Amino acid sequence: DGNLDLNTEQKRLVEETYKYFIRSGAQLNSTSMRELTEINQELSSLSVQFDQNLLKETNEGFHLLIEEEKQLEGLPSDFKDQAAKLAESEGHPGKWMFKPTRVSMYPFLTYSTQRDLREKLYNSYIKRGDNDNERDNKNLAIKMVDLRTQRANLLGYETHADFVLENTMAKSTSRVKDLLDQVWEPGLARAKKEAEDMQELIQQEGGNFKLAAWDWWHYSEKIRQLKYDFSEEEIKPYFSETKVLQGAFD
């Protein structure tokens, strides 16, 4: 309203506050507002349950327990030490344990020479919340998708994506699609070339198998070492938390 005589910052604040109230259902009638409140409450409850299931599945579900040190071939010594400590803390002294977490899985997928073990750990990560047990998240995910759609429609949006993107730089699903269309072809071409290089290396090493998802990190690291003569382990000491903080504030 031009009669308010607001400066740029004040106008921005008013616009954002107004948008917040609209997105919270301020223009809905009492019946629709109650429905929105119920949807938000149920979504909040389901989200907490979903996260708890995922956490339990990660901590209490599958774990890779290794008893013979020869199965640790290729793993850095500090990573093996961490796995030994984890196994001991879980009641398995003298063994090594790996769980489907990023901090445990990615180094294992990168350095382990045991393809069958890489496959087991990778698949356990992908299957979290999808094992038809008390921690299964499939039905929760379906309910959450349905409720998000109901909320978006109630507030005048076609999809949940439209509702979420309105407050981002992208603003709309069409702009997101345009951006993805720009990067899809070159990204896909790059990925195919990397996969071809990895498959070629597999064949050179005498491997009689097709590159799979659990091989990607391992052969990507091998190719990096061959092309650039360095490994992530070599530069890791230079990026410790202490050194990074010193570099940032010195």
Task: Give short role names for the model-derived ranges.
Residues L4, Q10-V48, L54:
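Extended, charged alpha-helical coiled-coil/arm scaffolds that mediate oligomerization and mechanical coupling
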Residues S89-R128, W216, S220:
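Active-site-adjacent "gating/activation" loops or surface patches in catalytic cores
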Residues E16, G25-I39, R128-A161:
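A conserved hydrophobic secondary-structure block that centers on an alpha-helix together
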Residues E9, S24, L28-T31, L109, ...:
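Conserved aromatic-histidine-acidic binding/catalytic patches
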